[in-house]
């Protein structure tokens, strides 16, 4: 899917902006604070219901505005008639629409418009806590397994119920019932995550040859409980410890994707530049996999490309994105900081004081 029209109202400095993106590279340039990143936030909001910089609405609201609204037209990468999608967020409600109809879940928008995002905090995928890497695996599972989101929601609901039962000192009989249900839902998540990682490995091996500094990268998935036991068994065995702690200490919510470079944790031994190379490779591997699995690539957002990558890695990334066939939105202060060679479809946009115009 691609965007061929984007309209933003009330988001930070963007009071009302309209954009007609091309199907290839869309380069948005301008000085810091002009609204470049806000434009990418709007696209992310349209797909996921939140910004990649914050999940809070208040920082996004333009002065004297009580709502953020993003509407767009999307169409298949193969052509065909575009159709409208949109989202409106206030402090009290969120409304999303596809083809004029309200959607029951924001997951419907996310499935329609898969996004990969690279921004100044993307290094947290390898240097941050385990939650960042669980989210990486969950993204892939969500976009290829129609049941995954339901499993994930059920697991989160059951986990909250079990934690409440632990804090309330509920009898063992009730906890046992939660353990059985939680074990079933959690095992489904675990299987999907482990399977997704295995499908990514061939893509990662191929990309390692193009980025020599990542040749020693190895990934290991740890499920979050004793691999010799079922989840229900581990939950039963951890009841007393969980009662003392007041929360559940085993399960896929404690899973980890270990990233090692030459046998040592990437976060400990890799420079910030090496960490960015690993993140690039992980994101590109997942994008290539999505393309082959679904038949179309994700839309890719790259915020402040020149600040994030040196010239060699900028060239490598842009070549990869050309080959992938993604619609790409890139921000930069200066337009000449982004390589344009090889793009059949590209357009420059200049942002100044929250207004957008086409041109160099």
UniProtKB/Swiss-Prot annotation:
Pfam families (alphabetical): SMC_N (PF02463)
Lineage, top ranks: Bacteria, Pseudomonadati, Pseudomonadota, Gammaproteobacteria, Chromatiales
Keyword DNA-binding among UniProt keywords: yes
Primary role: The RecF protein is involved in DNA metabolism; it is required for DNA replication and normal SOS inducibility. RecF binds preferentially to single-stranded, linear DNA. It also seems to bind ATP.
GO biological process, one term: double-strand break repair
Similarity comment: family membership: Belongs to the RecF family.
GO molecular function, one term: single-stranded DNA binding
UniProt binding sites for ATP: 30-37
GO cellular component: cytoplasm
Originating organism: Thioalkalivibrio sulfidiphilus (strain HL-EbGR7)
Alphabetized InterPro entries for the sequence: DNA-binding_RecF (IPR001238), DNA-binding_RecF_CS (IPR018078), P-loop_NTPase (IPR027417), RecF/RecN/SMC_N (IPR003395), RecF_2 (IPR042174)
Entry keywords, A to Z: ATP-binding, Cytoplasm, DNA damage, DNA repair, DNA replication, DNA-binding, Nucleotide-binding, SOS response
PANTHER family: DNA REPLICATION AND REPAIR PROTEIN RECF
Gene encoding the protein: recF
Protein name, as recorded: DNA replication and repair protein RecF
Top-level lineage group: Bacteria
Major location category of this protein: cytoplasm
Coiled-coil residues: none
Subcellular location: Cytoplasm
């Amino acid at each position: 899917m691609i965007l061929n029209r984007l309209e933003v109202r009330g988001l930070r400095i963007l009071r009302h902006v309209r954009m007609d993106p091309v199907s290839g590279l869309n380069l948005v340039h301008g000085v810091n604070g002009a609204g470049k990143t806000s434009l990418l936030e709007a696209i992310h909001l349209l797909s996921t219901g939140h910004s990649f910089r914050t999940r809070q609405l208040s920082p996004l609201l333009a002065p004297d505005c009580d709502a953020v609204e993003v509407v767009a037209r999307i169409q298949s990468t193969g052509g065909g008639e575009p159709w409208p999608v949109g989202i409106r967020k206030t402090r009290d409600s969120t409304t999303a629409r596809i083809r004029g109809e309200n959607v029951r879940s924001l997951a419907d928008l996310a499935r329609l418009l898969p996004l990969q995002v690279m921004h100044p905090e993307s290094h947290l995928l390898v240097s941050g806590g385990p939650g960042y890497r669980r989210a990486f695996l969950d993204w892939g599972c969500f976009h290829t397994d129609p049941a995954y989101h339901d499993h994930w929601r059920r697991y989160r609901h059951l986990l909250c119920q079990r934690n409440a039962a632990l804090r309330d000192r509920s009898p063992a009989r009730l906890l046992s019932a939660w353990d059985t249900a939680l074990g079933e839902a959690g095992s489904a998540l675990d299987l999907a995550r482990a399977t997704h990682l295995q499908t990514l490995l061939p893509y990662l091996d191929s990309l390692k040859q193009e980025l020599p500094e990542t040749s020693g990268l190895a990934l290991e998935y740890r499920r979050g409980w004793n691999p010799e036991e079922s989840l229900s068994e581990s939950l039963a065995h951890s009841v007393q410890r969980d009662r003392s702690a007041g929360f559940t200490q085993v399960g896929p919510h404690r899973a980890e994707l270990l990233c090692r470079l030459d046998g040592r944790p990437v976060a400990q031994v890799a420079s910030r530049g090496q960490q960015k190379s690993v993140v690039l490779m992980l994101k590109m591997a997942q994008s290539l996999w999505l393309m082959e699995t679904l038949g179309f690539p994700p839309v890719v957002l790259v915020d402040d490309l020149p600040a994030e990558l040196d010239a060699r890695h900028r060239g490598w990334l842009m070549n990869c994105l050309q080959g992938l066939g993604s619609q790409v939105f890139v921000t930069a202060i200066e337009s000449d900081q982004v390589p344009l060679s090889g793009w059949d479809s590209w357009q420059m946009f200049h942002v100044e004081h929250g207004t957008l115009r086409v041109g160099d």
